[in-house]
From Swiss-Prot:
One of its GO terms (biological process) is replication fork processing. CDD domains: SF2_C_SNF. This is Putative ATP-dependent RNA helicase L538. It is an enzyme of class 3 (hydrolase). Residues 14-151 form the Helicase ATP-binding domain. It holds the Pfam family Helicase_C. The keyword Lipid metabolism does not apply. It comes from Acanthamoeba polyphaga mimivirus (APMV). A motif (DEAH box) lies at residues 101-104.
Amino acid sequence: MDSIILKNHQKKPIEFMKNNRGVILYHSTGAGKTLTAIYSVYQFDYPIIIIGPKSSKKAFTDNIEKAGMDISRFTFYTYTKIKMILESDITIFKNMSVIVDEAHSLRNENMYNLYISSALMLASKIILLTATPVVNYFNDLAVLVNIVRGEDSLPTERALFDQMFYDEETMTLINAPILFNKLLNTISYYKIIDTINYPTSESHIKQVEMDHLQIDEYKYYIKQILYSNENVPDNVDIFNINYGLLPSKKRNFFLNVTRQLSNVAKIADTSPKIEDIMKYIISGPYPIVIYSNFLKSGIYTLAVRLEKENISYKIISGFVSQDKLNMIVNNYNNGLFKVLLISSAGSESLDLKNTHQVHIMEPHWNESKIIQVIGRSIRYGSHISLPQNERKVDIYRWISIFPNQYRNISADEYLTTLSQRKMELWNKYNQIVIDASIENNYFAK
């Protein structure tokens, strides 16, 4: 094999795997998880299966070749493909080493994910890669811990997990010592603190007042969803919404549609938010990444404006083939176009270079998703070809608010606050994860 110099945070999980069945590789985006994973399993004689989104195949192939490894020992399957195979062969992982990229995708225990989780119990060695082990709920991590342990160590049902470890009324964690013991030595944790090889970044919160078309559509959804199309008394301030008191199903549906209109009204082709984003795009510097959870009311709307301004761009979404995705990323990294528009489905496993601006068009339910998106542009060596004074990424988070006369909280503002509160709680939970990691126990001096 070629003499790749592994970093200390990569050597520890590789060493850990010599005497253990598996580990969750919870390392920052851009920390070299792919390389760590392939070295961790290549030291054994088992054939190696890699499972991941189609966008991660090239990164694995490139790293395997860079390391001078025998690529014939590796077989790559997308999540979709492995689910099809498991329908006829549940023992495919027996006597195999398995790497699962973006392993948080297994958090939802639907039928196909249960197939994968159950089948992975037969693997001889297992490495689960994720920069975001908790996406929506704390029990997301339980599925991964159980796979690594090869047994049901933690409850995966959300209600039971919360009953054991989370007090919803006070938003505090409980039974921390029990949780610590369940997590002990199942996770390798590493957070990037390198200030030399990574670009600096600065975040900017940009609030934009909605126009009258957005306000009218907002009223429509309030009446249709929250009041079920019943007549609303004239003296009721329909914009005064206590989101926390709404039934969860109704609240989630309402927030989903209002997040979309916060970008642009259905009957419009632009909005104050779109126009303000365009000002930053036109001014540069390039290249620029734009993220939206929505296609029609986000990515596509902005693409039309870019066309009108004759600004070069490409789109990465769930509809883009692997070959085309690789070509787009390569062209972006070589400065062949100015703006990259990415959707939620297209945001995983991208390795972007020299990005100067990242725009988050609307808030997300969970801060971890946004952190993951930003991490695609802030990576080890991502700006190394630029002069030192140009190695900076400006991050713009866009929030639509009501005009002053309404004095109410918009859906964007509510989601931003909710995401921040969940992040504060997650930080406490995350500290338990860190304390239980192999770095603080198995390798503790």
